[in-house]
Amino acid sequence: MTQDLNSYFKELGCDYWYEYDKVYGDLDVKDKVVIQVGGDCGSSAIYFVMKGAKRVIFYESDPNLVEKFRKDVCSWFDCSRIEARGKWDGKDYPDGDIFTIDCEGCEVSLDFSAIRKYQICLVSVHNWIPYEGWAKLIPNLVNWKLVYGSRDSKELTFRSPW
């Protein structure tokens, strides 16, 4: 690949690569299974595999982005350790080690008791969710560590305290 990864994914319309070291850089994903809600075109799944993840399962509700992952991204990268699934229903918590959710609005469907099974969880909260969503999320995020705020301050990512 002749261009850097940030430019590659930006040209695909998946302009988040620049965030990954800030959000996920301190995660030890080596030989771990990462479950990800909000996979976009698979750029973060590629990031995790490049950092040594054993396997990544990601959910993405936009079929065009899943197709872009399969057609474009996998033509450049080895995607054999990545499974792309469709829309997350808020009830599916596959076995794994690390759980991340960065899916606009999906965070309000999160079952905080279900994610306790993972070693580490990252939850991204978006400022455009309705008040009722915030009211549900905030009590569950007490004692979680704020690890990232987006450039536009419209998204905050929290890491589980366990």
Give residue spans per PLM region:
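Hydrophobic alpha-helical context, especially transmembrane and signal-peptide helices
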Residues: 4-6, 29, 33, 144-146
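Short loop/turn elements that flank and shape the SAM/SAH-binding pocket of Class I
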Residues: 88-92, 106-107
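Rossmann-like AdoMet
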Residues: 1-11
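SAM cofactor-binding core of SAM-dependent methyltransferases
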Residues: 10-90
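Conserved acidic-Pro-Pro-aromatic motif
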Residues: 96-162
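Intrinsically disordered, low-complexity N-terminal regions enriched in serine/proline/glycine
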Residues: 7, 15-19, 92, 117, ...
